[in-house]
Amino acid sequence: TKFYHALTKQRRVRNKIVGLHDDLGNWITEENGIEKVAVDYFDGLFSTTNPTDFDNFLDEIVPSISPQMNHILLRTATEEEVRQALFMMHPEKAPGPDGMTALFFQHSWHIIKKDLVEMVNNFLVTCNLDPRLNITNICMIPKVERPTRMMELRPISLCNVGYKIISKVLCQRLKICLPRLISETQSAFVAGRLISDNILIAQEMFHGLRTNKSCQNKFMAIKTDMSKAYDRIEWSFIEALLNKMGFDPRWITLMVECISSVQYRVLLNGQPRGLIIPQRGLRQGDTLSPYLFIMCTEALIVNIKKRRG
C-alpha cells in the first residue's frame, strides 16, 4: 500500500502545473494568472467564426432517415433502456463536477431508477437540459514531460453521470441509423465495421504505389492532420447537416441542446477554476461526440468524391 501511495504522490508532483507561457511568451506562475492563461486559451479555441452558407457543401448529402427511424429515435425511454445505458459505463471512471462515479448510481439503481427514467424522458419531451447536468470539468493530460504551454496539454471532458446517461440513451438509438448514413470508407464507430480494415487498405494502397511503376507517375497519397478537429466543429454546421440527412427537427434540437448547453471549468492541479461558455466544438469525453464527428466527416468525404468525379 505504501508503494502505491508513494507512486500516486510522485505522479501528482510530477504533473503539477507550476507555470505556463501565455500567448505573448511570458512565463506566468501566479495561480490566478495560470487560470487566465487556460481560460483565455479555451475561450479562443471555442469561439465561433459564425459561418452561415452550408448549402453548396451539403448539396450532395441525401436524406436517409425515414419517418419510422425518426419515430424510434424520439420514442419514450424505457426503464430497461436507461438501465443498459447506466450499466454500460465503467463504474470507477473519473467523476464529473458532481463528484460521483457511475458506481454509486449502479449500486443505487433499485432506489433511483424511477427518477433516472423520469429525467431522461423529461429531456426527450421538453428538449431542455437542467443546466447543472451539463457543467463539465476539463482535465488536462500532459502530452510531454513538464508541459509549459497549453498546446502541450490534452483536454479531456469529465461529464456528470446524469448527463452521461442521457447521452448514452441517445447514442444507442443513433447507432441504429449510422450504417445508412456513413459510407464504407469510414469504419470507426459503426456496428459491423472494424477500424483495422482501413489500416489494411491503406497498407495495400501504399504497397501498390511503391511497387507499381505506372502508379508512381499518376497517383499520390495525401495524409491530413485535423488539428483540434473536435474543438473546431461549428454547431450551426451540425444542425444544418442533421437537417439535410432527414432527422426530425425535435431530434436535431435534442442534439444541439446536448452540445451547446455545456459550461466548462478547468481543472488546475485538481481544482476547478474559471468558467468557459463555448460557442462551438464537441467534447472529447462525451459519448455523442464520436458519432456526430463521423457524420460531419461524411460531408467532407462526399465532397471529395464529388470533386474527384
Across the structure, where does each feature detected by a protein language model lie?
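Surface-exposed loop/turn segments and immediately adjacent short secondary-structure elements
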Residues: T1-M151, S157, I165
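Conserved catalytic palm subdomain of right-hand nucleotidyl-transferase polymerases, strongest
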Residues: G19-H21, K93-M100, T148-L158, I199-N243
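Conserved pre-motif C helix in the palm subdomain of viral-like polymerases
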Residues: M151-I182, L200, F206, Q279-G309
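Short, residue-level hotspots on alpha-helical faces of the histone-fold
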Residues: D40, G44, Q106-H110, K114, ...
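Active-site-adjacent bridging/hinge elements
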Residues: V13, N134-I135, C139-R149, K175-L181, ...
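Residues immediately flanking
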Residues: P91, P97, K143-V144, V161, ...
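Conserved polymerase palm-domain catalytic core
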Residues: M226-G309
